[in-house]
Amino acid sequence: MCAPSGPGNKFPDFQAETNEGFISSFYDWIGKDSWAILFSHPRDFTPVCTTELARLVQLAPEFKKRNVKLIGLSCDSADSHSKWADDILALYKMKCVGCDSEKKLPYPIIADEDRSLATELGMMDPDERDEKGNTLTARCVFIIGSDKTLKLSILYPATTGRNFDEILRVVDSLQLTAVKLVATPVDWKDGDDCVVLPTIDDNEAKKLFGEKIHTIDLPSGKHYLRMVPHPK
């Protein structure tokens, strides 16, 4: 197994122990048609990590709507993950008044105690260590498509919590642009206008989008900024 070198490359299959049991094949766990997000955190029972995973409990139904499976990873044991889950769920209930009550985490967490998987996937943070001096995992996010290729990777330092609403927005963009010949502009949200790919000439664009194209006039005189409604 080797780490994915960038978007478009095949994500490695692997086996792993989790708080929900043993996964004999990551590919089989994802399934044929689903997407997946593999996210690592530095350590169980720590403040930033607890806020992150509680937020993911709240957003899990949104990821499920998009056919995206979630799975976490840290170098803690499966037993530690299971005990920590009570804190995560308690914080979720405090932050999400009126939300459906969750009795268990809606995602498994990999127990990578020997750090072998995190090392292979390039998830380790050399600047973060436990009391024994062992390195810890960074806040990494891998988005993997149904074709088992890496679509996006983001690496956050331990001191910066992730914005999972942004991750959800990125999933919307990735899933749309995987099937439609458009790109998503700055601050795009699902339902907003998109841009025509620069690789598509005007004639082909007109065949695809008809009269819906709105070309924005710019000082250069180049007609490259072509907006189209969201292709539902």
Curated annotation (Swiss-Prot):
The catalysed reaction is: a hydroperoxide + [protein]-dithiol = [protein]-disulfide + an alcohol + H2O
* EC number(s) reported in the record: 1.11.1.-
Catalytic residue positions: 49
Q: Could you list this entry's UniProt keywords, alphabetically sorted.
A: Antioxidant, Oxidoreductase, Peroxidase, Redox-active center
- List, alphabetically, the SUPFAM superfamilies matched: Thioredoxin-like (SSF52833)
Instruction: Give the range the annotation lists for the signal sequence.
Output: none
| GO terms of molecular function | peroxiredoxin activity
Kindly list the biological process annotations in GO that this record carries. Answer: cell redox homeostasis
- Residues in Thioredoxin domain copies: 5-176
Cellular component per GO? cytosol; mitochondrion
The protein's matches in PANTHER family, at most eight in alphabetical order, are given as:
MCG48959-RELATED (PTHR43503), PEROXIREDOXIN-6 (PTHR43503:SF4)
Q: What's this chain's function?
A: Thiol-specific peroxidase that catalyzes the reduction of hydrogen peroxide and organic hydroperoxides to water and alcohols, respectively. Plays a role in cell protection against oxidative stress by detoxifying peroxides.
Which family is annotated?
Belongs to the peroxiredoxin family. Prx6 subfamily.
Q: What else is known?
A: The active site is a conserved redox-active cysteine residue, the peroxidatic cysteine (C(P)), which makes the nucleophilic attack on the peroxide substrate. The peroxide oxidizes the C(P)-SH to cysteine sulfenic acid (C(P)-SOH), which then reacts with another cysteine residue, the resolving cysteine (C(R)), to form a disulfide bridge. The disulfide is subsequently reduced by an appropriate electron donor to complete the catalytic cycle. In this 1-Cys peroxiredoxin, no C(R) is present and C(P) instead forms a disulfide with a cysteine from another protein or with a small thiol molecule.
Q: Know the name of this protein? A: 1-Cys peroxiredoxin
- Organism source for this protein? Onchocerca volvulus
Which taxonomic lineage does the organism of this UniProt entry have?
A: Eukaryota, Metazoa, Ecdysozoa, Nematoda, Chromadorea
UniProt lists the gene as: TSA
